[in-house]
Every structure is written in C-alpha cells, then in structure tokens.
Amino acid sequence: MEFSNGATQAQEVAPYNESDTESEHSAMRRIDQNEHGPSSGGGLYPSAPGVSAAVAPASAAAPQRTFADIVIRRMAHLRGPNIWTYRAVIEAIVDIGELEDYPSNALPGFYERLTAWLPGLIEHRCSVGRRGGFLMRLRDGTWPGHILEHVALELQTQAGMKTGFGKARMTGEHGVYKVVIRTRNEAVGKLAIESARDLVMAAINDRPYDVAATIARLTDLVDRQCLGPSTACIVDAATERGIPHIRLNDGNLVQLGHGAAQRRIWTAETDRTSAIAEGISRDKDLTKQLVAAAGVPVPEGRTVESAEDAWEAAEDIGLPVVVKPSDGNHARGVSLNLKTREEVMHAFAAAEAEGSEVIVESFIPGQEHRLLVVGGKVVAATRGEIIHVSGDGKSTIGQLIDTQVNTDPRRGEEEHLPLETLRAGDAVLLLLLQRQGLTPDSVLPRGETAVVQRTGNMAIDVTGQVHPDIAEQMALAARVVGLDIAGIDLVVEDIAKPLRAQGGAIVEVNAGPGLLMHLKPAVGRAQPVGEAIAEHLFPGNGTGRVPIVGLIGDGESALASRLIAALLQLQGQQTALACGDGLFLGARQLSKASALGYEPGERMLINRTVQAAVFETSPRHILAEGLPYDRCQVGVVMAMPGPEGLQDLYVTDAEQMPNIVRTQIDVVLPQGAAVLNADDAEVLALADYSDGEVILYSIDPGQADVAAHRARKGRAVLARGDDIVLATGADETSLVKLSAPVFTELTTRLPGDVRPHVLAAVGAAWALGVPPDLIRASLLHFCEVQAAPAVH
C-alpha cells in the first residue's frame, strides 16, 4: 500500500508519535476506491485537472512575473474519521487566484528553487506510484493547491512529524481548493500549511526564503505540543492493536480505550501506578530498605546534609563511595568511585547543585545497567558505556568533547533524544577530569584518551543476555516497591550471571522510567517496550472498547437513537447518548442542547462509568469535525440526507451526499455490523463499504434486495403486517406486535411513521447480541414510558 504523498506504509510509522499505518482499518481501501487519488475523478470534490501540452507552455518560454499570494480562507481541524481518512487532518480552503492559469511548468525556475529548498520531495510518490513521482508531476505541470499539500507534508516530516496522507481537491469555485493534510497536532498542521504557502510563493516569485528557520519553528512546536517519546511509543503500540486513545491534556496524559474499559497513562506511569509506590521510589533510602528486606542486594548508604556529613558517611561506609542527588535524571550530578576527602567534598557540591537531597553510598564495582520491568516481567535491558575522547595533539578536551561526543546524533536537548549534550563546564565532568590530572583546556597527546563520562550512557541493548536469576530479582524489587512499571538501575559485572554470586546490587528503583534508551540503543535491537506496556494494560486481545452505535439519517433520527440507547440501558449497561435531543447518561439528561458534535461525544467516551454509547451525527458534523470515535460496533444509516444547508462547506449536489454518509459505515469494525434502510436505494448501496456484517431493515417485507440478502443467509428486520420480524436467511421470528397498545399510543403522540425508527433500533440491538426476548421487553417498556402522560 502507498500513501498519497508517496511514502510506503512501512516508511510512515512515526518515530515518536502515533502510527500512521492504519493497519487495523481499511483506510487504504477507502482512499483507493473513493475519489481520493491525485489523478482520479468523481467523488465529493473533483481532482485537480491534469496538464496538457496545449495548456501549459514550457517554463523557459514564459516570462518571469510576480503573483499575488495564495489566500488561505480558513482552516478546520477534523479530529475524527471524516470524508478523507480515519485520522485527524487539517482541511484548508485555499484560493490560488490567478495561479489557476499557471501550472508549475509555466513558472520559470520554480521547479529548481523548490527542489533545492526541499530535496526530500523526491521521496513523494504521488499518483505516479514510485519514488520521484511527485517531482514528475511537478515537472510536467500541476497546480499550487496540490503543491501546497506536498510541501506542508514535507515540512512536517522535516520537523520530526512524519505523516503520509494528503489531498488537494477543487471545490467547484474557480481557483479555490480544499487542501488536506494528515497531522497529529492542530497547531503544527496549521503552521505547516501557512509556512508551505509562504515557501511556495517565495519559490514562484523568486524571493529568498529561510527554510531552516521555518523547520526550526515547526520542530520547536512539535517538541512543545506533541506527545513525548515514551508516551508516544505506548500510544503507537496501542493504535497498532486497535486500541483507541484520547489525549486528556496538553501534556502526556492519555486515555487508552473508551468509557468503563479505558486505562490511562502518563509517560510510563499507568493508572495502576499508585501514589504510594511512586512516593516510595522517590525516597531512595526507603526504597533500598524495602528492597533489602526482600533479600535483594543494595549498596549501603544514607542521605547527607553537608559536605562534611558526606565525608563522615563515606568513612562510616568505607571507601570507595558514590555521591549522587536523590532525585537525579540522566545520571546528572553522579560521581563514582570516590576515594579521598577532597573528591567526596567536590562531588557533594556537584550533586547538591541538582536541587535535591544528596546520597552517599558504597561503590559497587561493575557495569551499570537499566532494566525495564512491566507487569512483573523484565522486558528490556541496556548496558551503559564509558565515554572517552582521544587526543590529536592539538585540540583541547573541551573541543574534543564537541567533535567526538556531542556529534553523536543521539545527543541533544530535544526530548526525543536519548542522550544529553555533554558540557565541558559540568561539575561532575570537571571532577572526573581533575581526578585524571586534567581540565577542559588540557590538550591530549595524539592517541591518549581521557574519560569524560562514566554514567548515564545507556547505549547497548542486552535484553537477550539477562540471567533468569537477575530477572527474578528485578521483578521482586518492582513488586516490593509497588510499581507495575519500573526502571531499575543495576550494577553488575556480567548480566548473564546470577546477581549475588558476583556482588552486584540494585542502586535505584524508578517510577515513570524513560523508554528512549530501549527504543534507540546505539548497539543491538530496539525493544518493543510500548507493546509490552499495551499488553500489560490490555491483556490478550483486549482493545479497551465499549459498544458504540453510530447513527445518521435525514435529520429525524433522534427517536431511533433514543430507542437504541434505551434498549442497551435496560439490558443493564450504563449507556451514554449524544443526539439531536441532547446529551444523556442513562435516564439522566445532562444537556438539552443538540449533542451531535465531536465534543459531546468525546465527553461521553471519557466518562469511566459509560459501558455503551449511542451517537447520532449529521453530514455537517462529519464535514466540519469528523466523528467523535475511531470505530464503532454498529453503524446505522436510516436515510440519505440532502445537501440543503451545506453550501458553505462546498456541498451543493445530492450526488455528493453518499460520499459523506458512507463515513458512518466506513468505521464499522470487522466484528460489527452496518444496519441499513433497504427501502432507500442510496443507503442500500453503502453496504459494500462495511468491514462487518450487513443487517437490512424494511417496511416492505417483499423488497427484492432484502430477499436477495436473505438468500445469502443475511439478517434482516422486517415490518410484516402487524409484526416486527427478525429474519436470518429463510428463518423468521416474530418479535412484537405493532398493534400493542403502547405502540399505538406512541404513534398518536409522535409525527410520521415510527416503524423505521423501531426497525433501526431493533436491528442495532440485534447486531450487538441483545437477545430477542430482552429486545421485546425493552421495546415495550420504552414505548410505555414515552406514551405515559407527563406529570407536572
């Protein structure tokens, strides 16, 4: 499969945020079979026109001129499944003005300037289907809307946010296009489109443009706005398993799953990580006390108050010792193998500068390791390396650090990098050099080496070497502290041998451990730590989903929505309902305002009491926001709505409506069902888009399409005379009499024919596995309640 901007599915797995592979969806079928291809026609919006030799003169023959800027009329963030794809996108309405008459091959020098600024565009395959495909389109002639799409995607990629989906479509208004790009963050996506417009106009008008500064701004925004790498790798793994997620704040608090089935993570902490356990892990003395009580070796040591106290502790413990901050990170402020009073005193100052208490403990000889324990199992292990610089007879040690150490692409200040920049003025580094008789200004003779960092360089994966005894001891330590996920720092000579036999010891047990060292080791394989955490939270085939029913009609579908919710609620499930009549939780109405939008739906899915949910939607909300859920168990389409009131969204023709409404069926899970009104031919035609089963309903039991469906052993809900009938193939079961007093009373109270609403609701409940007897009882109870006179 290929994404429209040219990257293959395998290439588009994001390095630090959610995956774009959509492997649990049939999104690529949607893209390929719908209008979504840069050279395809038809569908909701027509594709950009092709360029013929008669239309586009050779660029060399065209005079250079200055064009007015492309105008971005508005941008919308479609947060849920939409007419374009299953994932969040930015949709921009773009007016290219007079450039409608000037394709790319009619703009002198444009191709050369654009490709020089963004050489990565060669990776975009576009509709050509191979590397360099977009550049072929660019050279042969394509329009600025299409170019804007690819440039925005490339800017996001250069900023560290790889995404693989983009579209540019004409709206029907001359020179006005819908430009759509996949993004993981609204602010980043919008800035990418605005920056792409500025860059494209600079290339068209032969003006200078600072590409590096633009990418730097976007990179900074990605770092500030997007999920951190540890959280993101868990979300990626969950997404690959079909587990939905909702970001709950601007940081790294993420909900995995929906409603009562949800779990929550915050970086590498989960809702099973207790505050008590985290508090214990922060108290290093208490942690060592508890771990030692369980029989796991730890170094002797204590917290100290001053440099003098540190030396007294060192004398009591016995030299050599380690001095470190109690709450250090990335081994900042840690000094090892200290043997003299002067060294201990200097090390205390370096540790105290980190802003926490200072610990002195016995030095354990060996190599430092970090082991990740998840759910009582060691799932990853890395070994540290000592960092040296090698002299050339000319450069100072400070210069050698910059040229030999800080050039490592894994080092830097960005959150997604596993190692920090090494600074020559760091107090621990100064002490380390002093102990070697050196300073940052010392010049090493050619071939001589100096140690510049002893701790914090977890770079070598050793997961496959961990001895079972060590794995057992690490799991025990995590359990004693009370952490479901723990990063354990271990010093041992050989991780492939039993712990106690070689005098190794646990030096720290950490809550919320960083995962980058396991994702980006310098040597060895990256470990699937995100997958391990996802499995820990959702064992087996768990997806964290609650039953969701999505429904769309012609604006009169609230009754069916309320019927479905009542059937589920009366089955004993706490059911949320967001529909045109308002927002409901069980029998309680939370709001009387229309709740068709994204936010009311998401509000219900965040609620931990919700065991099932029913969401009514409309074409406008699909176009303007997207659905509030990624997939549903049941998708119901009652009627094909018309285009009235959608002109501002460039929908003016009834022929455009099926492509909008199909979104509701596109998101049906493979184990779910589409419930379709067989009496509406346009609705019936949506059956092909369902990944799951199709259940038809009809007030005409002799309808030919229903008969053909039943001949294929399909299920249908029918109104036959006085009966509502459940049919599976040739088998039929009478469910309830429509002549029952509660039905007739309800019919007199409500306008129109209530039968389609009842049939749709019965079909949805049946699709969810509600037994017929319970459907019957719940249906009669609902009608009884609705038909009862109001009490004032």
What is the meaning of each model-derived region?
Residues I72, R263-L422, P468-A471, G530:
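Active-site nucleotide/adenylate-binding loops and adjacent lid/helix of ATP-dependent enzymes
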Residues F3, A216-L221, P244-S281, P297-R302:
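A short, GP-enriched loop/loop-strand-helix hinge that lies immediately N-terminal to
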Residues L400-N457:
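Extended, charge-rich helix/loop segments that form flexible
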Residues Y650-P658, G672, D691-H792:
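Adenine nucleotide phosphate-binding catalytic loops in nucleotide-utilizing enzymes
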Residues A238, D489, A578, E616, ...:
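Residue-level signal for inorganic ion chemistry
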Residues N541-G582:
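Walker A (P-loop) phosphate-binding motif
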Residues F584-R710, V742-R749:
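Flexible active-site lid/hinge loop adjacent to a nucleotide/diphosphate
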Residues E2-F3, N17, R29-E35, G41-E240, ...:
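ATP-dependent carboxylate activation and anion-phosphoryl transfer catalytic cores
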